Each structure stands twice: as C-alpha cells, then as structure tokens.
Amino acid sequence: MNQHDPLHTCKSCQNEFTGTFCNHCGEKILTPSDKSFKTILNNIILAFTLVDSRFVKTLWMVIKSPGALSRDFSNGKRVMQLSPTALFFVLNLIYFFFPVIQLFNASLNTQLMSPLRGFYSDLIAHKVVNMGVDLNSFTLLYNLKTTSLAKLMVMVFVVVSSLPLNFLYWKKNKYFMDHIGYAVELACFNLFINIIVLTMIMRLVGGGGYLDETALTVIFIVTNLYFVLRSSHTFYHEKGWRLLVKSITLILFLKVALEVYRAILFFITMASL
C-alpha cells in the first residue's frame, strides 16, 4: 500500500481505508466517472454478461433435460445454474414487456369458448349494462385489462398446476416445495417454448392467423407431453407403464389447471373493470 494514498471514509459502514474498495464491507469509492452514461451502460452489459452464461445453460437444461433443474435444485446442487424461480422471473420479465402469443392470457373471445361460457355470458351482459358501453367497447377494455393482469398472475398457474403433483407422486417422498419447483420449471418451459419461441416463429413465417384456440391446445399438449415424459422419469424416477399413464394424467390435469387459471383471471379482470 502506498503511504501517500488518501484516506477514505466508507459511506456504508464508516470504516476508514485507502484504495478504491472498503476492506470491511466492499463498498466502492464513487467517482464522477461512475455516474457517466458510458459507465452505467457498461455496468448493465457486464451484469447481463455475468448472468448470461448461467441463464443460457439453465434454459438449455430445461429444454434438453426436463426435470434435471428441479432435481439438482431439490438435491442442493445450485451453484452452476439459476434456480427455477430465478429463471422463471427472467422469462416472465420478457413475457411482461413484449407482445406474445396468449397462452396464459385469455381474451374475452377465448373466455367465451370455455366450458363456463354460458355463465360468463350472463356476467358480461350484466357488466356491459352497468358500465353503459356497447359490447365492442367493453371487449376492448376487457382485453387491455386482462393482458396486463395475466402477465402478473402466471405464478397462480404454477401453484394450481402443482396441486395434482402431490396426489400423483405422494409415494415419492417429495416436499410440497419440491413439487412447486417442478411446476416452476414446467412454467419456464411453457414461457419459453410455447410463448416466446412460438411467437418468434409465427412472426417469421407469418402464420399467426392459423393459431386459434384449437391449434394452441394441440401445441400445448404435444410440447408438455414431451416435458412431462422426460421430467417425470428424471425428477420422480417413474418408468414403464406408470410413467406413461401418469404423464397422460398429468397432461389432463395441466389443461384443467390452465382453465382454472383462466377462470380466476376472468373474475379478477371483471372485478377490476
């Protein structure tokens, strides 16, 4: 250490030190250059660079080896990749800020194709009269509101979809939070494959007009069957005919969970208008 180095007082812990960083808490001396736009931009790029390798590695693990992330996280192997929850919030952030295919979102037209459409129609008619607007105006207001709410409520789907896991795999000695972690990984898979990637493909080929509710349901079933078959073997150690039967059963539960989530979204949207 140079004896001519100036003595600084740490802004965080009041420790006196020389150099750039506090030797007690690690706080950095703030200089005018640290407040420049260039430095701020460099710090943002650096932050993304440091996270990027783990993010890409974790995302690739979810796609290539479904269930491995949940297994490693449950077993305490957590340093080399992001946690399922951290990955979920990164993907949900992308989902929140960009216009994408509505899987977790559901327009008024989509809601009116649900098994509860008769009940929904009566509520909508009553709401339209109370608001004093026509159906077209109400549809516009509803769709704007439900889009923003849906992007905040994806975790509701995670919780709902985790409930059947406790029933299907109760002999596997898994904790409730293990099932939640698995459901979060499943949500990450759907956010990336069935929303982000599918949106990019449709934008490139211009086939968005063909993606009606039936097409989305088929894609949802096929992609999730791939995930569930692979992940149930990896995470729950299922195999043979039990793996197939439980995977198909879980797909049915996931479709029900999606409808339950959309029903919750409908009632919250209606209440907020």
Where are these regions (language model features)?
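Membrane-proximal intrinsically disordered regions of secretory-pathway and membrane-system proteins
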Residues: 1-273
